[in-house]
Amino acid sequence: MPIELSTCFIAVDDHDKALAFYRDVLGLEVRNDVSYEGMRWVTVGAPSQPGVDIVLEPPLADPNASSADKEAMAELLAKGLLRAAIFKTDDCDATFEQIRAGGGEVLQEPIDMPYGVRDCAFRDPSGNMLRFVQPRG
């Protein structure tokens, strides 16, 4: 019984800024951008992975979450304490330069890690940590 990832979620505090980053800087395609019941359902994904969607959603969008929980999540996001995703690339250095040129907030320049990847890190416009890895070998 094989299991595959289909969808993951990244908390964003501004859909338009997030779309500009994930679409225009990272090169992900917009798969859905639908408004309903006061919410906005936005999904993006890598063109090379048509079966994997990333949902860009408000922090703790669960309608059953308390206002205190929502405030706590928004605070963690604002502090940049949420790790969102690790993306694989075939050229970490070129990816780094592309994201830096697009205005990404640099957290770590490309370095070789002892566990077999070349790695760099940025924050997205909402404060999420995103890592970009190139397998070595």
Segments (PLM) and residue ranges:
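Short acidic-aromatic low-complexity motifs
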Residues: 12-16
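Conserved active-site tyrosine of GNAT-family acetyltransferases
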Residues: 18-23, 99, 127
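Short Gly/charged-rich anion-binding patches and loops
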Residues: 17-18, 94
